């Protein structure tokens, strides 16, 4: 099923019993988090809070959509896949686009033509009139306090925009960048844009600022759009492909865009709400603290201030929100689903990898378990260093455990068995100092810089050990078949 906008997706989820409307008045201040957290942990439906209420008890004008991607199955649906396992096909497409192989012959070349044709035919379609501009607030009418922005945790400093799809463009780039950055509400037309220096939006901003030190930098933030575009923004799309183009490929139809009223940036035409504005030179503010996906409140830091000059929206718009906290939360669920996209990408680069797993308990990316067909001494160390460096998404992975292909990376019992029986703590541990670490990781010695650990839990080859290696106990297949045949007669 392909969804042209968020409302299409909501309708399908509701039809399948995967979305529930909450008519009872609920406050965005802490209450929505409590409800969404309980529902997500129970693997429950997406939620549409129809009557969000303000602190004074009056009602906000706009409903709040939460827990949209609260199960891997809903993530797969949003990406146009029939099941979570089908996400690997999307990963295979991305792997090909990232590093296309020369055709092996005429037949192979022709077999690739439909995919290439589909990709290049998915250039966005720019329209002049769009639903997202049916209502326009400008100047003094701009008031972010009229939006039901969620205040997620008791010690959060202020309400927080969490699912804002931030649109930027660098001075030398034709394609626009889409990124998800949290934004702290500090005034009726002011948000703090918390983007880390290596993220696409921050890089665009830095390049622009070098060339235009005194010029306001245009930014747009999209709140609520079709699931393909949202998920395209968190998928490792090759630099040669725009997220809008990738969203069209997922959807099977070109992404419709409209030019912002106040800048040349383009936003999804059927978005629910769009914030248009600028970042003024040298205007920053203290951001945080906020409860985050680690399960802790993070440190404060100074980040650019986004001044909202205009808010455009559809008639009766829906405000899309989430919360982040100790796993499981929505980012952790997204990580579980996108894990299936990552596997073919890694296998394209390292064909010896048989599986790859990011345990959600590891905050989506801080720990990875990799299984491989080992071929020589030291091979596991090559794989772990390769994983750290291949995709930007794994730059902050602190721990990588490498196991043989007879170990199920998604079963902690098997992984712990491999670690405790195939590892020597001194010989098989790789420690790397002074590497990039998540800004939110307060366990690192300094902010943004810390260590990494690789655990080689593979069987050791000559050159790695002089000892005779243990043989894994295996059952006699003939006995297993025999017992299978009489099992029902044993009264067990």
Swiss-Prot record:
InterPro entries: UbiD (IPR002830), UbiD-like_C (IPR049381), UbiD-like_N (IPR049383), UbiD_bacteria (IPR023677), UbiD_Rift_dom (IPR048304). Belongs to the UbiD family. Signal peptide: none annotated. It comes from Neisseria gonorrhoeae (strain ATCC 700825 / FA 1090). Its main location: membrane. Mn(2+) binds at residues 177, 243. Homohexamer. Its cofactor is prenylated FMN; Mn(2+). GO terms for molecular function: 3-octaprenyl-4-hydroxybenzoate carboxy-lyase activity; metal ion binding. This is 3-octaprenyl-4-hydroxybenzoate carboxy-lyase.
